[in-house]
Regions:
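N-terminal Rossmann-like NAD(P)+-binding subdomain of aldehyde/semialdehyde dehydrogenases
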Residues: 2-116, 144, 284
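ALDH superfamily catalytic-core signature
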Residues: 9, 14, 21-23, 139-140, ...
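Conserved active-site and cofactor/substrate-binding residues in soluble primary-metabolism enzymes
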Residues: 22-25, 29-32, 44-47, 51-55, ...
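Short, flexible turn/loop "capping" segments at secondary-structure junctions
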Residues: 30-32, 227-229, 257-262, 346-353, ...
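Conserved C-terminal structural/oligomerization subdomain of aldehyde/semialdehyde dehydrogenase
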Residues: 42, 326-395
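Rossmann-like NAD(P) dinucleotide-binding subdomain of oxidoreductase/dehydrogenase enzymes
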Residues: 106-245
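Residue-level signal for inorganic ion chemistry
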Residues: 149, 206, 271, 320, ...
């Protein structure tokens, strides 16, 4: 157990920070130390908080490239260059978005009615981090915790714990150097379901990013929770749409980090008048349309017993085709299966965190909406859907 002492303006803080959190007792001790640190952090001024927020965001942004490389190397998923962008967004863009936001003391006052709104931290945040976006999610959650004077305990995914903890350490060290209390950011060294559940029970707020089971557990914990679960994004291409723009946008979205962004398109629903044109544009831009027998092979590869096959997550199209026993050009961008059913019994109708798309031909616009609604419902309402349409021409 390390004993840390730091001078922060008029504050003298002594925090006993356990070196690790590998079992329930150690986690409990680490949370006690964090509560002590957070009680001091809650007294900081806006000026002190903003200095810490800036230093932490700057440090995370400067480490965006090595952290991206570490995440890909550890998980075997995704694209280094795209993870660099995600880390950049989670640090510099988040800083620029919230740098002028007041989070301490009186943040709003209505003198006419005698009302003041005062910002107060909630306490300790439990942050559940996914394997798909480990470093960027850890950076983002740690930064918003610092900006709001909360402590944050991170539970990494077991397959991404090294890179997740590395990102958290960078943010913590920069924050402490800028004046934050020791132990204000922590993590579970060897995450287990037991420790994650214990963390959710002990925390004051849960930020859960992950699969449906995890998000449901967070919502059922009895604590306030904000969940980011799976999506099943449909994209409708209307017959008035700019076809090249629509196809290029979908390809860019679906190939970014090998399709691991949960808001990326999972299905394309096309109106009959432009179906052949859309198909031709996808093929022209390097996508591969699977033949009927190849569709069946890919079906069996992307889903196993109704669940997404972990072996395809974050892999490129060529690798997935190889796993399925399908021969495609090595530079293939996306594997596209033309299917009819939107039922969950159709493997292509599920969320696929990889460059594999379902493509549907709608009878008309109403049919396209019906198909899209069914896909969104199966993936979870309140997530993402997109529509490519020229509304002026439609009118």
């Amino acid at each position: 157990m390390a004993i840390k002492e730091k001078n922060i303006g008029v504050h003298v803080i002594e925090v006993h920070v356990p070196e690790t959190a590998e079992n329930v007792n150690e986690l409990s001790e680490k949370l006690k130390a964090m509560r002590k640190a957070q009680s001091v952090f809650a007294t900081y001024t806006q000026e002190q908080v903003d200095k810490i927020f800036y230093a932490a965001a700057k440090a995370a942004n400067q480490a965006r490239i090595p952290l991206a490389k570490m995440a890909v190397e550890e998980t075997g998923m995704g694209v280094v260059e795209d993870k660099v962008i995600k880390n950049h967004y989670a640090s510099e863009y988040i800083y620029n978005q919230y740098k002028n936001t007041r989070t301490c003391g009186v943040i709003e006052e209505d003198r006419a009615f005698g009302i003041k709104r005062i910002a107060e931290p909630v306490g300790i945040i439990a942050a559940i981090i996914p394997t798909t976006n480990p470093t960027s999610t850890a950076i983002f959650k740690a930064l918003i915790a610092l900006k709001t004077r909360n402590g944050i305990m991170i539970s990494p995914h077991p397959r991404a714990k090294k890179s997740t903890i590395a990102a958290a350490k960078i943010v913590l060290e920069a924050a402490v150097k800028a004046g934050a209390p020791e132990g204000i950011i922590g993590w579970i060294d060897n995450p287990t379901l037991e420790l994650t559940n214990e963390l959710m029970r002990e925390a004051d707020l849960i930020l859960a990013t992950g699969g449906p089971g995890l998000v449901k557990a967070a919502y059922s914990s009895g604590k306030p929770a904000i969940g980011v679960g799976p999506g099943n994004t449909p994209a409708i291409i209307d017959d008035t749409a700019d076809i090249r723009l629509a196809v290029n946008s979908i390809i860019h979205s679906k190939t970014f980090d090998n399709g691991m962004i949960c808001a990326s398109e999972q299905s394309v629903i096309v109106l009959p008048r432009v179906y052949d044109e859309v198909k031709k544009e996808f093929a022209y831009r390097g996508c591969y349309f699977l033949k009927p027998d190849e569709i069946e092979k890919v079906r069996k590869t992307i889903m196993i017993d109704g669940s997404l096959n972990a072996k395809v997550v974050g892999q490129n199209a060529y690798t997935i085709a190889k796993l399925a026993g399908v021969e495609v050009p090595e530079n293939t961008k996306i594997l596209i299966g033309e299917v009819e059913s939107t039922d969950i019994s159709e493997e292509f109708a599920h969320e696929k965190l990889c460059p594999v798309l379902a493509m549907y031909k709608a009878k008309d616009f109403d049919d396209a909406l019906t198909k899209a609604e069914k896909l969104v419902a199966d993936g979870g309402f309140g997530h993402t859907a997109s529509l490519y349409i020229d509304t002026l021409e439609k009118e």
